[in-house]
Amino acid sequence: MTSTYTSNTSIQQDNKIATLINVFTVEPKNQQHLVDLLIEATEKVMSQQEGFISANIHKSLDGTRVVNYAQWKSGEDFEKMLKNPRAIIHMNAALSIAKADGSLYKVVFVDNLAK
């Protein structure tokens, strides 16, 4: 499964959004399957939830990690999604093949060439 989208992700310091950074540890043989599960969850469930802004899935070159960098309008919107039965099904599928370490973050510094 490969999807190509233009991202709505904008990283700005001191904005009011909630940023989820979720690092999954996975066996290399399961890395692409996990990526596919996360993309499917995003397309079918997460993107339909109130407050969802964007999700960006990254996979490590050594095959042992997958990172989901997602943005939500608020922490409350993110917490509400966690209680959605459809979201729980997708999260459990991912957790059946990987260990997750996720937290919500606030951007405090950004530096780029386009100043």
Task: Mark where each language-model region is.
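An amphipathic, aromatic/His-enriched active-site/gating alpha helix that lines ligand/cofactor pockets
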Residues: T2, A41-I53, Q71-K106
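Residue-identity detector for glutamine
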Residues: Q12-Q13, Q31-Q32, Q48-Q49, Q71
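Short, well-ordered beta-strand segments in beta-rich or mixed alpha/beta enzyme
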Residues: I17-T25, S54-N84
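Non-catalytic surface loops within mature trypsin-like serine protease
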Residues: V26-P28, S74, F109-D111
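Glycine-rich beta-strand-turn "strand-cap" elements at beta-sheet edges
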Residues: M1-A18, N56-T64, H90-K115
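Short, surface-exposed ligand-recognition loops at beta-strand->loop->(often short) alpha-helix junctions
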Residues: T25-L38
